[in-house]
A protein has these predicted regions:
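Globin-like tetrapyrrole-binding proteins
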Residues: 2-199
């Protein structure tokens, strides 16, 4: 990926809790080894037919373990009943969008630039959605938890590394969009200077 630092996924998961992801320079850079990429592709094939169920489990667990995440999902903010969440069409749809993103990431896992662009774009969108970076790692942790019984420790570690890569790259995208928005608002706040010729 052209990253100067290769990091393995931390044993404690998720790795951080910085609400805004720090500065773009503070974001951990992770590279995916060839072995990790192969393990991810293989294990994705094993669960591909079960993505809808995994997406629901992931979000129900996310809201149970991190109820503050509901603040970003306004339609679920007042829903406390796990069964209501499990049967929610909106939650199922969002779970499928997340799983679709994971599928696209796996499909691009050997195409570094395309994978980076996909994830950076998602991070930029999350700035617009006002979804702070501290939540990104929670989603990966709940995905892994939902799959824990089906995976080997090697598969789990590979996915931890992938989600660390995804969350750190999303944070970079979030920070880039935050900086772009600030620069645009700075330009709009500057007084316009008109130059007129005096005769």
């Amino acid at each position: 990926m052209g990253c100067p630092l290769s990091a393995e996924a931390p044993r404690s998961w998720p790795p951080g809790d910085d609400e805004n992801g720090g500065s773009e320079d503070d974001v951990v850079q992770v590279s995916l080894s060839a072995q990790i990429r192969e393990v991810i592709k293989q294990s994705w094939r094993e669960i591909q037919d079960d993505v809808s169920r995994v997406g629901i489990i992931m979000f129900v667990r996310l809201f149970e373990t991190h109820p503050e995440c509901k603040d970003v999902f306004f339609m679920f903010k007042e829903v406390d009943d796990p069964e209501t969440l499990r049967t929610s069409r909106e939650l199922r749809a969002h779970g499928l969008r997340i799983m679709s993103f994971i599928e696209k990431s796996v499909a691009r896992i050997d195409q570094d630039e395309r994978l980076d662009q996909l994830i950076l774009d998602l991070g930029r969108k999350h700035y617009v959605y006002d979804a702070p970076p501290k939540y990104y790692e929670f989603v990966g942790a709940e995905f892994i938890q939902a799959m824990k019984e089906r995976w080997t420790s090697e598969q789990e570690d590979a996915w931890k590394t992938l989600f660390l890569y995804i969350s750190s790259t999303m944070k970079r995208g979030f920070k880039q969009e935050q900086r772009n928005q600030r620069n645009q608002s700075d330009v709009l706040r500057r007084p316009s200077v008109s130059v007129s010729k005096q005769v």
